[in-house]
């Protein structure tokens, strides 16, 4: 595969807007889908070495910003007559309570990219793409897991959020993947915590399984395992 990712002009424009020391990465599903040869729906961006206030000031001069997600380190940026992009500052998460929302979130612009990637649920979602260098950053072997259709947790922090089990169900079904034995063991250890999750969050993952899966039985097998 050509390792230069096709990127919208509006996203590349960030390189001209941001200070030279600020490093923007594409993160999450867009990198995963590109590597799988799947059409990319959303480009999510994480910018290191810049404060949230400065990022908002810069982007507000070149489009509309929505700061409703600021407490989570995320803003939405809509360039003039363009699509909307989620742009985040790196963050650290500390488990403080039950369920999907029981976390204390602290943004840290100077966070090491490897540490930032470690909070992702599965290795296939931890792969980053450096927009300045046009280089893949794969600290946790996500590319190998994609090639081998292996669904593997990124770190032991996986067990802090039971929703990640159901995300695994729909990922397995969409991409034809099997659970890594250690990951399945972690899933079994938190399966009794589903009652901590809002029903709509569980439904959302089931909906993705039903509406987007090419291999629905793979998802059910992941859940059974």
Language-model features and meaning:
Residues 1-225:
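Catalytic cores of the polymerase beta-like nucleotidyltransferase superfamily
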